[in-house]
């Protein structure tokens, strides 16, 4: 570029309208988007052959658990990018732990109740042990069998509720009994019953559980995802970059982005470490070993950064499980599945938000969209 062209370019730039300074936006409420975000109305993780899902939702207070059941087993992997996770058996799903051996998972548990809720995985183990004995009832002394049931938790204990009510082993067992291959209930059910978003600002919006699936053309490959969204951060529409839901103003009528508060250096209510998180499971019918599934889980976790901001915060315990049921034997590159897993998990996160139902004092996205904060 010569000097004349450069001067012309600079003159053109000078004629453009000035961009607003960050300081001009600080502390100003953000209006609700006029048009609700469009997310697929169909598709669930159960579209992956070999995957079933069951919920237990407690009717005494908002909490529960969700079981992703693999009756014939699935090769598992995991990624834990969150700062303060509450989980079970995630270490054995790391590639460095089992470099030469794949781990066969029979179920994954997503649960509320914080660490107390991990007890629900014991009920899932009991259910699977009983099914094992049913399959081997003709044998006088079946060999010992310990089902692998990884789990992750969200923090949904609130001082204004009886927080001693948490998912138990019986809750996990009932979720297994409810498991089906069909349509999966979304919103404030199972692990998403007590979920909320935008905690960092101190005045959150109700969230829940979402699921989605994606078929890769005519290849026969299916990728699915399910998640409970209880994020510290706000949720953004990836199509527009605009705030979708999250931290609200003190009067609760509008959203006030956490990032704007932080830019202003304003005091922000910091949640205690480990009190909030997004926990997820992605699955595919393509065949892979555990090392590849751990990489797929890691790639899928990119969905958090595309939709949640801030993501992977110190107060988050973000955990992503990945399962390969292996019913499709056609060779597929695992990087391609990881890329698609991130896309489908992004949709599941959005569905968790838009399908949530508000409760007194904590409106949902739909309540805010209609101008009816509770």
PLM-predicted stretches and their roles:
Residues 24-115, 130-374:
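A structural signal for small-residue-enriched, beta-sheet-centric alpha/beta enzyme cores
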Residues 5-23:
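N-terminal export signals
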Residues 122-129:
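Active-site-adjacent structural elements in enzyme catalytic domains
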Residues 119:
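Feature captures the catalytic cores and cofactor-binding loops of soluble hydro-lyases/lyases
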């Amino acid at each position: 570029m010569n000097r004349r062209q450069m001067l012309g370019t600079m003159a053109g730039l000078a004629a453009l309208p000035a961009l607003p300074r960050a300081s001009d936006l600080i502390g100003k409420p953000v209006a609700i988007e006029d048009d609700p975000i469009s997310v697929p109305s169909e598709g669930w993780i159960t579209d992956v052959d070999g995957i079933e899902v069951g919920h237990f939702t407690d009717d005494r207070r908002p909490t529960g658990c969700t079981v992703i059941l693999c009756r014939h087993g699935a090769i598992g992997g995991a990624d834990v990018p969150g700062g303060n996770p509450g989980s079970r058996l995630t270490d054995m799903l790391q590639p460095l732990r089992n470099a030469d051996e794949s781990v066969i998972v029979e179920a994954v548990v997503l649960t509320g109740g914080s660490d107390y809720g991990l007890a629900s995985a014991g009920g899932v183990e009991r259910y699977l042990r009983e099914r094992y004995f049913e399959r081997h009832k003709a044998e006088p002394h079946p060999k010992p069998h310990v089902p692998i049931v990884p789990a992750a938790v969200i923090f949904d204990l609130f001082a204004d509720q009886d927080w001693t009510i948490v998912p138990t082993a019986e809750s996990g067992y009932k979720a297994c009994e409810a498991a089906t291959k069909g349509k999966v209930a979304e919103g404030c059910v199972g692990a998403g019953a007590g979920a909320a978003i935008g905690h960092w600002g101190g005045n959150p919006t109700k969230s829940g559980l979402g699921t989605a699936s994606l078929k890769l053309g005519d290849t026969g490959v299916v990728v699915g995802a399910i998640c409970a969204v209880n994020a510290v951060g706000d949720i953004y529409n990836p199509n527009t970059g605009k705030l979708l839901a999250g931290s609200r103003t003190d009067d609760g009528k509008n959203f006030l982005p956490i990032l704007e508060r932080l830019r202003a250096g304003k005091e922000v209510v910091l949640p205690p470490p480990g009190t909030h998180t997004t926990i997820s499971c992605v699955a595919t019918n393509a065949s892979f070993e555990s090392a590849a599934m751990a990489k797929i889980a890691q790639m899928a976790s990119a969905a958090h950064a595309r939709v949640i901001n801030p993501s992977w915060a110190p107060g988050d315990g973000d955990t992503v499980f990945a399962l390969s049921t292996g019913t499709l034997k056609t060779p597929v590159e695992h990087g391609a599945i990881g890329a698609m897993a991130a896309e489908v998990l992004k949709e599941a996160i959005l569905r968790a938000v838009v399908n949530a139902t508000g409760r007194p004092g904590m409106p949902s996205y739909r309540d805010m969209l209609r101008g009816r904060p509770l």
